[in-house]
């Protein structure tokens, strides 16, 4: 065996040199020799055996590789000390070889190359017998240390050598006891243990101490082993690749466990690695999976002893801990363990494959690249995918697909190709065509696909294709946004919707009956049906505005239905009835109709009517009482004329307010209806036309028999049925659906409501509430009370020594915009209508209009001004006379306070606030008080969060400045406002906590002021606006003088007088 080992050693020498990492391979040869020596019983003299010890010297390069194999044997010994002893008993013959000759042979690595001659020497056995046992014991201790000490571990791994070859079986016999001990750790150690024992017997006995002593010297010999490993690299990595996948499977990372399993782990790997000399390296690489975990630890241990290669060698034979794990240099690749077990990083092509897979996106990579399949297979996939789309199971659930089908069940092939799953297969339309060409489930026609069996069964009738044209058009006409008033009118009326739905359906039960039935209650698209229902509800005022639309709309939406009714008298009678209703409603119920409109448009009012844009602001005409005698004298005295002005009663104010409404309507009517005068004249003639002969009447109204369809309405209208269909339509702004005559109210030309309803083009009037709710005139109502000098009162300018003089003010909305001219403030005429005349800074008398209030306004000295020019004049006067000295400026403050409540304009508000605060800083608080009144009443009417924040901010500032008026207005707002869950400033809440009643806001008048309050005819109109708070406020106080607006009797009286303006009347209430 020794001779065989020697030739192996020389042959292995180059191999070992080729793979420095696989020193274990060469080492197995020397180990085999050493082991064979002991097995043969002679070999001690054999220098070759000791040259295998030089092989130990080679492991000695690692520093402890040789020792590591011995420790495995020793490991077996540690498994049982008796094992070591038994080993020694077996090797008792070896003691003579313990002589240093082993060490002598170990140092010369060249002797290893010349192993063939020395191998026959028998002393090798002797050496193994004597030296290995003591060495084993020592190495056992070393292994114990190695478990905790990385350096010995490295030595062990480096000493690992899969040199055990065929001679191993003989070796196995003597160390079977050790093997058993190892088998206890690992069942596979039986084969490896003898090998290691034999190796340890020869090499360890002779060179254990030497290897430990001269480990570094042996490292020098390692370099020779490096080239040996080079030869092994190509074979090892390949096998390693296969083995790597298994490496992660074996969890042997804990060095302590390895120490415990020293014998067992190497035993499992050693047999595999030891079996074939050259193949042994490969198997060892395969065994590396288990070593894999140990490799990591061994790498740490072996770092000091020759790097990864040394660690491999040490593992090759060392059974203690990573004996054959890293064999074949596999450990060098452990960096890639976590990534690719097969060292894919080393192989370029494999890396490319992974790259492709990682960056794969079907939209960016062609299907051919992704799916490496032939065209036929790809076509089959495409066909199956699309056939699935058209399968019964899918169509029963896929409503999207069915809605996309046309009447014949076809779907565009482009739609199918756009599905993601099809795109993942291919984006080539031609390929899809080719794939579906021979399909038995679907068929292709031009560029469309459908199911072969019962294709027409699946399409779902969708609105997109057929219904869109009809439903789109009808829905537009029917939707409340398009015809808002009509929809709500019908529903708001006392259940007219149900009769409508019943009555019109039978009349229109033809092909469009379904469509008509649905929109009847919602739209004007079915005016005829609605007209019948309206006949029943003739008295309803709302139908009138919508009905004119109805006759037109049906012509577009349901032309077929109209012709059917046109020949019948129903249509005409319906139209006639509707027209008559319109006339009847316009007579007096237009007020209600307007009121309903306003109620209906309440939401829109909040958005539009309560706000006004800058262009509309430029259309405002201010109506003020500004003759020279009304001007304030330098000394602050007023002429007696103010008394007559202040005495204006609520009735007179109401008349003037109505007059301003009429005036505004005239402005708008004359602009948009230049023929209005002619129509009005004809309307005046309607009264005379009533005298028409019966023949003429029948000619003009060929279908008076409205009774069959409209039994109730015909009575009243007959009295005034006249041939004025065209004129009536013009007057009422309604289209002329037919030439049917309508009766017109005799008072139409004088009815403000009539004109109000007939001026839909007015930007504000049609949206505003009636005159009682949206006043045009803000009068100052006089209080006949005298001031009690000693009575507590509110701290306000009206109670000051020099109270401001408040003036009546009104406004109208002109039909034309009067843009401000910055060049001058002269009285140059503006763009106003001829009726209005020129509006300049110079007051202009009101033009004559058909209303008694005209004379009242004229007699009381009211003049009109373009708003922006009047504002300019006020600002100039304020600048000229000084802050707080301009009566016109105070009138402008008062106007803003009232106007902004119903017609908010951001720019106007900001200017109002700025000027009021500027005046307050100078000690003139009238503008600020007007601002607080606007805050309190305006927010109560239309809450705006940003304004509410300003209200809180200014209230805090006002209170901290020692004033109570702002806090009182805020307190009143919180009490009477409907707004809930308001976020109030904590500081303001603290201030409010001091005031529980309205009386708490009254303070004793300052000394010297009592005599100055003889005359307080003017009461800030903005302060009281008839708010219902007055009762509670007034009730809290007894009657007081003028200086105390909160008094009960006076406050209530003024409220009653101011009912005409509801919130806008200038009443004396506690709010003031």
Swiss-Prot record:
Residues 1-17, 122-132, 562-571 have a biased composition (Low complexity). The modification N6-acetyllysine is found at residues 869, 994. The modification Phosphoserine is found at residues 68, 81, 138, 188, 193, 198, 201, 299, 302, 494, 498, 525, 568, 604, 608, 743, 751, 801, 824, 828, 830, 838, 845, 1034, 1065. The modification Phosphothreonine is found at residues 196, 351, 503, 626, 701, 746-747, 759, 762, 765, 774, 822, 842. Residues 740-756, 1031-1053, 1060-1072 have a biased composition (Polar residues). It is found in: Cytoplasm; Cytoplasmic granule. Residues 1-268, 289-331, 488-578, 737-773, 790-837, 1003-1072 are annotated as: Disordered. Residues 933-976 are annotated as: Interaction with 7-methylguanosine mRNA cap structure. Residues 70-550 are annotated as: Required for interaction with PABPC1. One of its GO terms (cellular component) is cytoplasmic stress granule. The modification Omega-N-methylarginine is found at residue 213. It comes from the Eukaryota. The C-terminal region mediates interaction with the mRNA and polysomes. It is required for translational repression of mRNAs with a 5'TOP motif. PANTHER family: LA-RELATED PROTEIN 1 (PTHR22792:SF51), LUPUS LA PROTEIN-RELATED (PTHR22792). This is La-related protein 1. It comes from Mus musculus (Mouse).
